Design a protein with these regions (language model features):
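Extracytoplasmic/periplasmic ligand-capture domains
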Residues: 1-20, 24, 70-72, 91-92, ...
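N-terminal lobe/hinge region of extracytoplasmic solute-binding protein
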Residues: 34-88, 124, 199-202
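Acidic glycine-/aspartate-rich tracts in secreted/extracellular proteins
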Residues: 41-43, 100-101, 164-165
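A structural signal for short loop-to-beta-strand junctions that line the ligand-binding cleft
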Residues: 56-58, 84, 146-148, 204-209, ...
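Residue-level recognition of beta-strand termini and adjacent short loop/turns
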Residues: 87-89, 151-153, 213
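Surface-exposed binding/hinge segments that line
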Residues: 96, 132-187, 356
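Mature extracytoplasmic/periplasmic domains
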Residues: 361-381, 554-560
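Long beta-strand-rich cores associated with HINT superfamily self-processing modules
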Residues: 558-585
Length: 585
C-alpha cells in the first residue's frame, strides 16, 4: 500500500469521553481456556525449523525453550543451559546442557530427550554462517557473533566467537532477547525437513494442539509435570487469535469474545482498570526513522570474506539527498546529506505524535536505542521541533541531488525532493500504529515542502532489501534494539555493520559504529560498556542516522472476571511472555 502524504495529519479530534468507562462483561469464551487476541500479521503456520523462520516467540509462549531466562535483576537464570565458561582471551565459550529433558510427543512420535546435539543443530540451522539459506529472524545476528556450534558430547557445547559480545547470554540465547528455539535433531533426521517445517517438536511446558494458518493456534499443557517445576502451567489450555485491527481487538475484549487483548494506548484509555488489568513484559517499542542506504564500510568486517572488498553499493548509484556517498557525488556529499537528515529530523513534532496517536501515554524518543527516562540521559541529544529551521537548513545546501517528482511551488522551491517512508513490521506493521507514525512523519515532511509517500507493503517483500543492502527508503522501525527495556550499556549497532552481511540490517553501515559496537561488546565491565554506548549516542546523533519519534507502550489487558492473574517475566524482545504464569479465576 502506498499513500501520498500532502499535509501533516490533523491532530485527531479527541475522542469524546464515554459517559462511563468500559466495564468487564461476562465472557463468552469456553470454560477452562484463556483466549488472547494479539496484533500483527505474522502468526503464520506451525513451523518447527529455525532456518525456515519458525516463530521467534515459541520460547516466550512456552512451546519451546532456549538456554537462559532473565532474572528480576537482569542477570541470567539457567534454563536448558546449566552454566558456561568463557576463554580468558574471549575467543570461545563452553556451555553445559541440562540432561533428561523430554521432547514433546507429536503425532504419536516420541523423539526422546534433549542433548547438546539438539542445541548445536538448532543454532547451526538458524545461523546464516552455517546455513546460508536461513531466514531465521536473527540469522545475521548469529553470523556476526559466532561460527559453528559443536556438541562435544551429550552435555557440552563449544563455539568460537566471531565477535565477542558480553551480553550474548542475556540476549541471543535468552528468553528475554532475540534468541533461538531448541528443536529436536532426531525429528529432523527421522522425519525430514518438510515434516518439521509443519510440526513443532520442542521441550516447553505447552505444546501445539491446533494451528490454523494466519488465524489462531491453541496450546495445551503437556501430560505430566514439566521438568522445571516453576514453569508448570497454571492454565490447561490457551488460544492465541490473530486480530490485526486494533479497534477490533478492543471490541472483542469489550464484548467478552476474548479474555485478553493487546490494546493500543488510545483504546486502553477507554477501559475501567478496576475491571481490567494491564500486564506487559516491561517494554515499550521505540519507533524512529532509520536513514537506509548510507553504506560507509568498504570491506567485510568478519566472516569468510573478512578483509575482502564489498560488492558495488547499489544505494550510491543515484545522488539521493539523505544518503552520503563518500567521493561519488562531490566532496561535500557526506556533510550535505548529514544536514538534510537533520532537517528531516527536526521537521517532526514528536510531542504531537505522542499526544495524537498514543493518547499521551507513550514517550518521546529523540535517538533510537536510548531511553530519555534513563539517568544516563543528559538532554544534549534532543531534536527540537523546528520546521522553519528545517527549511533553512535544506535551502543552505547545494541542490545537486536527485529531486524526483517534487514540485517547486512550496517553501523549498528548487530544493524540494521526493521521499518515501516505509512502515516497518513492529506492532503489526503498516496496518497498526507503526503505519500511523509513518503517515505522520510523511505529513511533517510534506509540511516543509517535500513530496512524500508512506509505504505499507508486506515486510516479507521489504526485508530482502535490507538483507541485500539495497534499500534507500527511510523506514519507521525499532531496528533490533529499539526497546525501552534494553539496558543502556547493552551493545548496539551490530546490525549497522558488515558483520551481519547476509542477514538483517538497519540499512546503513559505518566503520565508526563497527568500532564502537566492538568496544561495547568486548567491555570487561558495565562502566566501560556505558562509556562506549555514550560515544555511540554522540555519533549517531551527530550523523542524524536514527532520529527517534515515539515509544509505544506494548501492553495487554485482561478481563478480571475470567483471568485471575498473569504476571509476565520481563522481556526485551517480546510483548507476550511466560504464558505458564497465566491463571484463570
Amino acid at each position: 500500500v502506498t499513500e501520498v502524504a500532502t499535509a501533516t495529519p490533523e491532530a485527531a479530534a479527541a475522542a469524546e469521553e464515554p459517559e462511563e468507562l468500559i466495564t468487564a462483561p461476562d465472557t463468552t469464551t469456553p470454560a477452562g481456556i484463556a483466549v488472547i487476541a494479539v496484533g500483527g500479521t505474522g502468526l503464520g503456520s506451525q513451523n518447527g525449523l529455525g532456518s525456515a523462520q519458525a516463530p521467534d516467540g515459541l520460547k516466550n509462549t512456552g512451546i519451546a525453550e532456549t538456554l537462559f531466562r532473565r532474572a528480576a535483576d537482569d542477570s541470567e537464570l539457567p534454563w536448558i543451559a546449566t552454566g558456561f565458561t568463557i576463554a580468558p582471551d574471549l575467543s570461545s565459550a563452553t556451555v553445559k546442557i541440562q540432561q533428561g529433558i523430554p521432547f514433546q510427543v507429536v503425532d504419536g512420535n516420541d523423539f526422546g530427550t534433549l542433548t547438546a546435539h539438539d542445541v548445536a543443530f538448532s543454532m547451526n540451522d538458524a545461523n546464516s554462517v552455517t546455513t546460508p539459506e536461513s531466514i531465521h529472524g536473527q540469522a545475521g545476528d548469529f553470523a556476526g557473533l559466532w561460527g559453528e556450534w559443536t556438541a562435544v558430547d551429550d552435555e557440552t557445547i563449544t563455539f568460537d566467537f566471531a565477535a565477542f559480545d558480553s551480553t550474548w547470554k542475556d540476549d541471543y540465547v535468552n528468553q528475554s532477547g532475540q534468541a533461538f528455539n531448541v528443536f529436536s535433531k532426531k525429528a529432523f533426521d527421522d522425519m525430514g525437513k518438510d515434516w518439521v517445517r509443519d510440526h513443532i517438536v520442542a521441550t516447553g511446558p505447552f505444546q501445539v494442539e491446533e494451528w490454523l494458518r494466519d488465524e489462531s493456534y491453541t496450546i495445551v499443557n503437556r501430560p505430566g509435570e514439566h521438568w522445571l517445576p516453576e514453569l508448570e502451567p497454571k492454565t490447561e489450555r490457551i488460544q492465541i487469535v490473530q486480530v490485526s485491527e486494533p479497534t477490533t481487538r478492543a471490541a472483542l475484549l469489550r464484548t467478552g469474545e476474548v479474555d485478553m487483548a493487546a490494546l493500543e494506548p488510545k483504546d486502553a484509555a477507554k477501559f475501567d482498570l478496576n475491571d481490567f488489568t494491564q500486564t506487559s513484559a516491561g517494554g515499550a517499542v521505540q519507533l524512529g526513522v532509520f536513514f537506509a542506504g548510507n553504506l560507509w564500510e568498504d570491506t567485510y568486517a568478519g566472516g569468510a570474506n573478512e578483509g575482502n572488498p564489498l560488492p558495488t553499493k547499489a544505494t550510491f548509484v543515484h545522488d539521493i539527498p539523505w544518503i552520503g556517498s563518500p567521493g561519488k557525488h562531490g566532496d561535500d556529499d557526506l556533510e550535505q546529506a548529514k544536514h538534510i537528515r537533520r532537517a528531516m529530523a527536526i521537521a517532526i513534532d514528536r510531542d504531537l505524535v505522542n499526544d495524537t496517536l498514543v493518547a499521551g501515554l507513550g514517550d518521546v524518543v529523540h535517538v533510537e536505542y536510548f531511553n530519555a527516562s534513563s539517568p544516563n540521559w543528559t538532554g544534549e541529544h534532543e531534536y527540537p521541533y523546528d520546521p522553519d529551521g528545517a527549511v533553512e537548513l535544506i535551502l543552505a545546501q547545494d541542490n545537486d541531488y536527485q529531486r524526483g517528482s517534487a514540485g517547486k511551488d512550496g517553501p523549498l522551491g528548487e530544493h524540494a525532493f521526493e521521499v518515501s517512508v516505509y512502515a516497518g513490521p513492529e506492532l503489526g506493521g503498516g496496518g497498526s500504529i507503526t503505519g500511523e507514525v509513518a503517515d505522520a512523519v510523511a505529513g511533517f515532511w510534506s509540511d516543509i515542502g517535500l513530496t512524500t509517500f508512506s509505504l505499507k507493503f508486506s515486510y516479507q517483500t521489504f526485508r530482502p532489501t535490507v538483507v541485500g543492502r539495497s534499500n534507500t527508503h527511510p523506514w519507521i522501525t525499532s531496528c533490533d534494539k529499539g526497546k525501552a527495556a534494553i539496558p543502556w550499556h547493552f551493545p548496539k549497532g551490530l546490525v549497522q555493520t558488515t558483520l551481519t552481511r547476509g542477514g538483517f540490517s538497519c540499512g546503513f553501515e559505518s566503520p565508526v559504529i563497527l568500532d564502537l559496537y566492538r568496544r561495547m561488546a568486548e567491555a570487561s565491565d558495565q562502566a566501560s560498556a556505558t562509556a562506549a554506548a555514550n560515544e555511540y549516542l554522540d555519533y549517531v546523533y551527530e550523523q542524524n542516522l536514527q532520529p527517534g519519534v515515539v515509544a509505544i507502550p506494548d501492553a495487554f489487558y485482561f478481563n478480571n472476571k475470567k483471568i485471575k492473574s498473569f504476571p509476565m517475566d520481563k522481556a526485551a524482545a517480546a510483548n507476550l511472555n511466560s504464558l505458564w504464569n497465566l491463571e484463570l479465576q
